[in-house]
Amino acid sequence: MQYFKSLLCTLLICALLCSCGAQSSSVPPKNDDFTAVPPAPPAPAAGASRRALRSRAAGLSYLGWRVFDTSSEAAFTQSVGDMFDKCVATGLNCVIVQVRPFGDAMYKSELFPWSHLITGTQGKDPGFDPLAIMVNEAHSRALAIEAWVNPYRVQLNEKTPEKLAKSNPARTHAEWTLPSDGGLYYNPALPEVQKLIVDGTMEIINNYAVDGIQFDDYFYPTTDAAFDTESYLALADGRELSEWRRENVNTLVKSVYDAIKAAKPAVQFGISPQGNNDQNYNAQYSDVALWLSTPGYVDYIMPQVYWGYGYTLQNGSDRFAFEKVTQEWANMPRDATVSLAIGLGAYRIGVGDGGQNDQTQWESGHNLADMLDTLSMTPGIEGFAIYRYEQLFANAEFGTLAMAENKAITEKLAA
């Protein structure tokens, strides 16, 4: 936890796919001004005082790779430098970059093919090493850098990516994969798959001076019992399906943690689960409460809390209102070796969170900065994360609002 706690306060623009179970996708009419007066955020609890959050990071997902010019090594280096300069100017101290979104690699790998996101073709060598450049550019600016890995996903659908390289282990070992809803995923139950993921993690930390490894919320892709029936019958040894699946995920998480700490104890391992922990446990088969409360699984947990103040479901429940669910996470039992940070949804700027609550907060130009105040007055929360980079720094649709949010965040971090 030394690296995570050495950070002064966290803005983590993690590009995690918006998959939280309580999240709605409804979108209000578009506009690019912020003249509306939003409701004030809830008043802090009596006696609450502001404190510096310990970590501030910017993360980039595969969805945001359009901000990079990958036409040449020089062009890529320049665009990475520009991005990281903006992070520093805002007051951030860490970047989290997605390096394996689809069983591929944004770096030179002996295990996984080059990502199609660099050249347009999976397996095609771009002629330079994006991760090596990003590590150098980050560290030259005193930014920490974490490599973000999606452990199981090979294809989101038949178009993403459209074609797998011949060298892809999902093709050379097709028996390691399972289809689900048009996508393709490694089978979490197989020891061979768990070894591949651990080996892939170690390849990154052994070859690159990254400061951490992060997994996002994508573990099991479905609750359908038919997804892994053959493996269940062969390997479950009488255990109930949900329990068995959670044990498979727990085994992977602990194996990755143990391997990292055996090789490079200072490298952090964290997971960014959904903000709705019921979904984590029952749909993703992720026992986040165990990881938080038990040493030896993770260094930090960063739930994706992408809802606004007062967020309300159609059934009238406001459990996932920002001010309530962040407190829910802060109240969960947590081992002293595990840190807690919160993910914030920059992609909601100008769009809203789809709840039954007042949406004008997302047109205020300072909603995320208000959230930083709430987090800084919530004991147990040590940092924050914003999904996602280009929605704050290069927002083509709501640029004026994003600039206002960025300015408010910068001022808040400098105060």
Predicted regions and their residues:
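Aromatic- and acidic-residue-enriched segments that line the glycan-binding/catalytic groove
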Residues: Y107-T119, R153-D181, D217-D237, Q356-Q361
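Aromatic- and glycine-enriched glycan-recognition loops and surfaces
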Residues: S71-T90, L117-R141, E247-K254
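Substrate-binding cleft of secreted/luminal carbohydrate-active enzymes
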Residues: T294-E323, E328-A415
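Catalytic domains of carbohydrate-active enzymes, especially glycoside hydrolases
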Residues: Q78-A105, N207-G212, G296-Y300, I381
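Polysaccharide-binding and catalytic clefts of secreted carbohydrate-active enzymes
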Residues: F76, N93, R141, A170-T294, ...
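Aromatic-lined carbohydrate-binding/catalytic grooves of carbohydrate-active enzymes
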Residues: T90-P126
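Active-site-adjacent "subsite" loops/lids of carbohydrate-active enzymes
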Residues: G47-Q78, E146-A147, Y152-N207, N357-Q361
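C-terminal motif of bacterial Sec signal peptides marking the signal peptidase cleavage site
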Residues: C18-S19
